Amino acid sequence: MPSSISWGLLLLAGLSCLVAGSLAEDAQETGASKHDQEHPASHRIAPNLAEFALSLYRVLAHESNTTNIFFSPVSIAMALASLSLGTKADTHTQIMEGLGFNLTETAESDIHQGFQHLLQTLNKPNSQLQLTTGNGLFIDHNLKLLDKFLQDVKNLYHSEAFSTDFTNTEEAKKQINTYVEKGTQGKIVDLVKDLNRDSVLALVNYIFFKGKWEKPFEVDHTKEEDFHVDQVTTVRVPMMNRMGMFEVHYCSTLASWVLQMDYLGNATAIFLLPDEGKLQHLEDTITKEILAKFLKNRESSSVNLHFPKLNISGTMDLKPVLTRLGITNVFSYKADLSGITEDDPLRVSQALHKAVLTIDERGTEAAGATFLEMMPMSLPPEVKFDKPFLVVIIEHSTKSPLFVGKVVNPTLH
């Protein structure tokens, strides 16, 4: 029996953090700012990551319209891109095209340099926004990896390599889960539930995000209110409330209210609240170009905002999802991973991803700032996120979509 590669993907959006944001702005746009020109590598792949994020979201939304969705396009793409370093022929082409890259238009070296710069930027220390990523390579002690693959994943993706005895499945599982738990500060536990004894390699990626609102909510203003899951289901949720100046507007193209909220640091959250019966229209119509415009054209207005506290997670088996995007060979006996090892043929037997999202009044930590705003005398309009909505988050310096999700029921954890 051919050996198999066991591949786990992990994402965490940190506790007490608001997750959402806008997808990547086209890096090739004319009139790019000086800031854009200073970060060409990650900006070149940003539009592709944005397209990949929306494609992946639509596959997940098509499979179920009754469950919460939450994932990190960056985390999944990073794991696939690093894996591609060891793939050849159709297996390689499928991964690159599934990620939204056309190798006749973009040099593969530029793609990997883009991910390398993305990693370096995301892992830079920031006193206001905590954002860290990590890549782990767990290698069976009997497996001989090709030096080029090992050096490439270490140099380009900063992967840490660990010797693992996969014949002792419990110990191997513990080793991988401990790495993940430590990297996500205890927020993701037991990512890997089962390991195949034939596994010889595990590729793990995680991302941890923790931030504070630039404009926090008052805890005393949070009250129990109704959230309408669908036409027949209503649940009670703690609803945060704040009257003030927000970057909120109505988008007729999407038939949705659009709310943008900044974190202290370098990230922005975008929430999209569709009109009654317009959720599928929003999902079908939204594009990276539309989201990029939201980031550019930001105007504040006075509103009475109601927003639910959240603590949701998304766990998925990526194999059927990626298969829908045309990435099939790597999971089958057609897999060509001969760039990883010259030993027995490999295939991907497991592809796991988990994400956690928590939203509360102040962000990750209590915020001590006080905000005084000038308000008009007239009563501001009310915007109430009391039915299913979409959420996206972007990291500004890389223009990368860190997280994408849909909140259907805030009470489902």
From Swiss-Prot:
Keywords, sorted A to Z: Glycoprotein, Protease inhibitor, Secreted, Serine protease inhibitor, Signal
Main localization of the protein described in the UniProt heading: secreted
SUPFAM superfamilies registered for this protein in UniProt: Serpins
Region entry RCL, spans: 368-387
Compartment annotation: Secreted
PROSITE patterns (alphabetical): SERPIN (PS00284)
MF annotations from Gene Ontology: serine-type endopeptidase inhibitor activity
Secretion signal, residue range per the UniProt entry: 1-24
Pfam families with a match to the protein in the record: Serpin
Residue(s) at site: Reactive bond: 377-378
Top-level taxon of origin: Eukaryota
Domain notes: The reactive center loop (RCL) extends out from the body of the protein and directs binding to the target protease. The protease cleaves the serpin at the reactive site within the RCL, establishing a covalent linkage between the serpin reactive site and the active site of the protease. The resulting inactive serpin-protease complex is highly stable.
Task of the protein: Inhibitor of serine proteases. Its primary target is elastase, but it also has a moderate affinity for plasmin and thrombin.
Similarity comment text for this entry: Belongs to the serpin family.
The protein, known as: Alpha-1-antitrypsin-like protein GS55-MS
Source organism of this protein record: Ictidomys tridecemlineatus
